[in-house]
């Protein structure tokens, strides 16, 4: 006699399934709400990682560059070096980035960026070739509406008021600015390097900007030019001090400057042409000037024809010999202090001590 126990197997299978669900306390992992939440969180993190960050990059020390906007993502740049290489192709020039982009700083220079994860959405950064940040108002030439997080209504009013205040301040402060050539001498052991900087309304916008230009020109071993002194030992504190009576300034870096009288005195190498220097008084360019004046002015010609000399000149070669002998015999009235030649030499003597690098070329041109 055979009995059918199939219904007992189905009942045991159902009880085993119920027992397993009670032991876990959760339904099957494939159908649980926890698993769906985990999958959503993973996809969200993955999308955030691949989402591009919109940032702006500037050139170090370039106050006229409006910046370039980059969409930085891990898909576009596999590494931080790849980002630096791409920025080099986009921003490199011979003036501000001569060696390409090697460093990235925050907009205030307080921190150096070392990876793409440190870049933040909507922020601005400065690219540099060397490990030296130049403080410049990079964002003043940029329209702030490029960021999606900034309201447009407030930004449309702010630039107008800022532009009007800047223009009024510029008109008020630029009255004393005039074209002037100043000499900057690097502090340190003599002989010292000196450069000449032209200041006018296009180059002298502010005191900080002039210090930046002097830093680029003088190239101190200690870095940035922090202080400037006149030859009298007075510190230059504002833009107006450049347009006073002083034309020569001593540039000092971050190091502590020790006042010494020898630091404010120019040696023989730094002042090659002085008032009592005979090489400046009788240069090779002094002879053409008397010839031109003697040929055009009839006064010296009449004085040279004395009765004794005129007879000798007529016996030898006639009138032409007296004309040729006139420049040699009449150099004394031409070198008088009131003549144009002496005034021209006097200006060179006063001006050339300020030029240390190209005094010879200026003497020839003048």
UniProtKB/Swiss-Prot annotation:
Gene that specifies this protein: Dcx
Example GO biological process: central nervous system projection neuron axonogenesis
Annotated coiled-coil segments of the chain: none
PTM-bearing positions, type Phosphotyrosine: 70
One protein family per Pfam: DCX
UniProt protein name: Neuronal migration protein doublecortin
GO molecular function: microtubule binding
Organism per entry: Mus musculus
Predominant subcellular localization, coarse grouping: cytoplasm
Annotated ranges, domain Doublecortin: 53-139, 180-263
